[in-house]
Each structure stands twice: as C-alpha cells, then as structure tokens.
Regions:
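Transmembrane alpha-helix boundary signature
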Residues: 80-87, 110-126
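N-terminal, membrane-interfacial amphipathic/helix-forming hydrophobic leader that caps
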Residues: 1-86, 226-276
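Helix-boundary and loop/linker segments of multi-pass membrane transporters
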Residues: 20, 90-94, 125-132, 162-164, ...
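Membrane-embedded alpha-helical segments of multi-pass membrane proteins
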Residues: 61, 65-73, 134-139, 147, ...
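Residues that define the loop-to-transmembrane-helix transition and helix capping
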Residues: 167-168, 209-212, 258
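Functionally important transmembrane alpha-helices
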Residues: 190-249
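Function-critical hydrophobic alpha-helical transmembrane segments in multi-pass membrane proteins
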Residues: 126-185, 196, 200
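Juxtamembrane "helix-exit" motif on the non-cytosolic side of transmembrane helices
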Residues: 43-52, 117-123, 182
C-alpha cells in the first residue's frame, strides 16, 4: 500500500506504477490509456442507442448502467496492471454515508454561493414549476458525477500524484477539470470551476481515499442548480436568474453561480475546511 503520509489515498506502487526507470513516463501513458477508456464509456452513453437502433427509452438503462460498467472495467484494469485492490471504487459498508455527506456538502456549498449572489443583488429568485427532475438527475447529475470523478480523480489525480507528487496531482487534475469545462463558458469560468469544484472534489477524494464522497458532492453540486434553481436550465421549483445589469463574471454567466468570481470565496472556505 502506498498511502501519502497525510492523506489516506492509495496511489499504487506495483505493476505499471512500480518504482524504477521511466516511472513518470509510464504513469502518463497509463493515465492516458485509462482516460481514453473512460471517455469511450462516456461516448457510449451518448451514441450507443443510436448505433444499435435501440428504442428511445433504452437511454435510461444505458446512462444508468454504463457508468457502473466503467467502474467495473476500471477495477479489473487496476487489479491486472497495478496488482492491487481498487479500493477507491470498491463498495463498502460506509459507502452510503460517504455519498450522503458529500451530497450535503455540495448542496450547502451551492446554497451558500446562491445566497451570496442573491444578497448582493446579482441574482433574483422566483417560483418555478417541477418538471423533468428525474431526467435532469440521470442524464446530467448522475452521469457527470460518476464519469468525471472516475476520470479526473481516480485516474488523473491519483496517477499524476504518483508521478509528480500528490500536490501536483491535485493541481494538474483540477486544472484539466477546468479546461474540460471551457466549452460551457469563458476561460474565467473555467478558472473558477478549477478552484470551486476541481480542488474541492479532489481534496474530498484525497481525504477519504475513495470516490464515493466526491461523487456525492459532484452530483449534488449539479443537481439543485438544474432542477431547483435552474441557473442554467429552467426545470423545477424555484428559479435563480442573474440580473442582466451586472457583469457576467460576477454571477457566473451562462454556466451559473458556480462559475461566479464570488463563488471562489465559498470554494476557498471549503478547501480550507478540508485541509485544516
């Protein structure tokens, strides 16, 4: 077991990640291969139904099932190539509790960000209608929470941490997480997401050594934003709309409150709470 002296995270020290010559190169190639596999699983959630000419309702089974298959596939590859138990993705007795704690953390973080923006007059809240909540959860929150945590935390953070040290693994994986969200907003939004989500979720994974709490945080961070506040998509219960008179970098633009410059304050508090 190779666990950092401070963080209970299994980095891997055998097989393809064994000490010795070309460790960094081997680590980068291994991370690239696993990331490509994870991306293949993700793309299959988007296109498998059309490729196989399946009925439209099959998309629910595809999106719910393929992330589970991705986790199983990851576990098989880790066992074979690294010669260890993939503890970061294995179910355990405290799994539900970890998911719940992560979900509460994500929910309250987004509540705090939205409340701050509302207090400063950058958002206004109005009633909305319940609709499409299950679809929003399955096709956005659940899918993103499972697949992005697998790729950016279990694969990139862990393996880059093995190659360059855990701090660099955290920073690099968080930066790549922000870059991956560039298509959703501006470069400034990507920087905010790097801090507010990338660092926070990475630290949660490092603090537990397992993905479940970070998956709960990730899922809850997305879930209420879409179905409850509808900061990017109008769907459910109450609607938080940014005031158009304010600069887009303050309320977060089209990506929503988690891309706000002011959300960095909440993200920094969360990071400090986890670290200290």
């Amino acid at each position: 077991m190779n666990k950092d002296s401070t963080w209970p995270i299994e980095l891997g020290t055998s097989g393809v990640l064994a000490p010795g010559r070309w460790l960094r190169l081997r680590s980068i190639l291994w991370a690239t291969f696993l990331s490509a596999c994870a991306m293949a699983f993700f793309l299959s959630t988007q296109y498998l139904g059309a490729w196989l000419h399946l009925p439209p309702r099959s998309s629910y089974f595809i999106v719910l099932g393929i992330p589970l298959l991705a986790f199983i596939g990851y576990g098989v590859l880790i066992s074979a190539a690294e010669g260890r138990k993939p503890v970061e993705v294995l179910p355990h007795t405290g799994m539900i509790a970890e998911i719940s704690v992560g979900a509460l953390l994500g929910f309250f973080m987004l509540c705090a960000v939205t409340a701050l923006l509302w207090t400063l007059g950058l958002y206004h809240v109005q009633p909305n209608h319940w609709q499409h909540i299950f679809d929003s959860f399955v096709f956005n929150s659940y899918l993103s929470g499972m697949m992005e945590e697998l790729m950016f935390r279990a694969i990139l953070l862990r393996i880059l941490g093995r190659a360059f040290g855990l701090r660099w693994g955290l920073v690099l994986s968080a930066g790549l997480f922000g870059i991956a969200h560039l298509s959703h907003g501006s470069w400034l939004a990507a920087v905010e997401i790097t801090i507010n989500a990338g660092l926070t979720m990475g630290l949660v994974y490092m603090a537990t050594g397992r993905l479940w709490m970070s998956i709960g945080l990730h899922t809850a961070w997305i879930s209420p934003k879409i179905p409850c506040w509808a900061s990017t998509i109008t769907t459910v219960c109450s609607k938080a709309c940014r005031s158009p008179a304010n600069p887009t970098y303050l309320p977060g633009g089209k990506f929503g409150p988690d891309a706000s410059v002011l959300a960095t304050f909440i993200g920094a508090l969360a990071v400090a709470a986890i670290v200290y």
